[in-house]
Design a protein with these regions (language model features):
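Active-site-proximal, substrate-binding regions of enzyme catalytic domains
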Residues: 2-100, 104-106, 117
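Acidic, PIN/NYN-like endoribonuclease modules and their adjacent C-terminal/linker elements
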Residues: 116-149
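Short beta-strand scaffold positions
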Residues: 110-111
Length: 149
C-alpha cells in the first residue's frame, strides 16, 4: 500500500481563479505529489458555472476529490468559533479549509491571505496561494510566464 499523500485543501478563490482562466484541470498536475481536495462547504460557495467546471474535474478527470467537512467534534467546534459573529467572523470556506488542515496536517490552498495568514501561522499550517501555484506551474514548464498573467 502506498504512502498517504498530503492534501491541498482548495478554497473557492483558487478554484475560481483557475476555472476562470480555463486551467482548473491543470491545478492538480502542478503539484502531483499532493492530493487535491475540495470540501463540501467550499463547493456551496461557488457560482454555478465554476461549480460545473469543478464537478467535471471531480467526476470525469478524478484529479480533485470532494470530502465532507466536520469529521470530529473538535473540528466542528473550531469551525463555529471562527465563523461566529462574536468571534473572528471569517468566511465559511476558508474557515473549513483551515480547520481541516489544522486537524489533518494538510495544506490550505487559498489566496485570501488577509483572513488566513494569522491563523495558519498560529497553528503551523502551510498555505499556498494562486500565485504560488502559478510559480510552480512555470517552474515545472506546465505554463509560460505569459500564460500566468
Amino acid at each position: 500500500m502506498g504512502d498517504k499523500k498530503t492534501k491541498v485543501v482548495l478554497d473557492a478563490d483558487v478554484i475560481n481563479h483557475f476555472s476562470r482562466g480555463g486551467r482548473l484541470s491543470l491545478l492538480p498536475n502542478i503539484l502531483p505529489e499532493f492530493q487535491f481536495i475540495v470540501l463540501d462547504i467550499v463547493k456551496k460557495e461557488l457560482p454555478i458555472l465554476i461549480l460545473a467546471d469543478l464537478d467535471k474535474v471531480i467526476k470525469q478527470e478524478k484529479t480533485i476529490a470532494e470530502e465532507v467537512f466536520g469529521g470530529t467534534s473538535g473540528e466542528k467546534k473550531e469551525y463555529f468559533r471562527l465563523t461566529a459573529t462574536s468571534g473572528p467572523h471569517l468566511g465559511k470556506g476558508e474557515s473549513a479549509c483551515m480547520v481541516y488542515c489544522r486537524y489533518h496536517n494538510d495544506v490550505v490552498g487559498s489566496s485570501n491571505t488577509k483572513d488566513i495568514t494569522d491563523y495558519c501561522k498560529q497553528y503551523g499550517i502551510t498555505y499556498l496561494t494562486t500565485n504560488d501555484f502559478l510559480f510552480y506551474a512555470i517552474q515545472r514548464s506546465l505554463i509560460t510566464k505569459e500564460e500566468a498573467v
